[in-house]
């Protein structure tokens, strides 16, 4: 993976934290007057704090929650349209879904994914047209450092800009091609249609909305490219 595929840009709008403190909360962009039709949440495990708060914020959204490792939602929530006991991946079978059927019949999708490494083959399975339906993508990546990941990040970057990057302090860092990168990190992508001008991110990481994923581990601080830039000029 070329570290430059993780270039972080300045968001054109303000951001907000959604979900519980520490692990389980994510930073999203507050797009003015946005109307999401669909929230797809993958890898919810025992925490639906993000989904509950998102639905409260966008009450008209239809929500699909996926996790093959649990039998039911951790708490009852009638606002979640559907819980599917399947993991998200690159194919469809009894235990896995690639989500193509839901993506193909919906527009203005918000997707939030934490599927413990399954994100790479899943993105590989998507077409550009399917990715283009995502208004925002919130995704955790798990050690995506082989050459096969370059295509994945290039595919996302075709229609989206990375506007928020946070190191999950669970698992340390590595020196990858001369850049210190977290082994696990959270990304928020915003569709390029929302940008009138494009500027590089100059804000230090973590930001004031971020919280440690693991409270008793040290935070991981980042103040260098491609994440933080001395100038906003692209």
What are these regions (language model features)?
Residues 121-155:
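A short alpha/beta connector and helix-capping loop motif
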Residues 56-62:
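Conserved S-adenosyl-L-methionine
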Residues 86-90, 114:
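Conserved acidic residues
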Residues 1-40, 47, 53, 84-85, ...:
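Rossmann-like AdoMet/SAM-dependent catalytic core
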Residues 46, 65-73:
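Short, polar loop motifs at secondary-structure junctions
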Residues 62-67, 85:
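Conserved SAM-binding motif I beta-strand of class I
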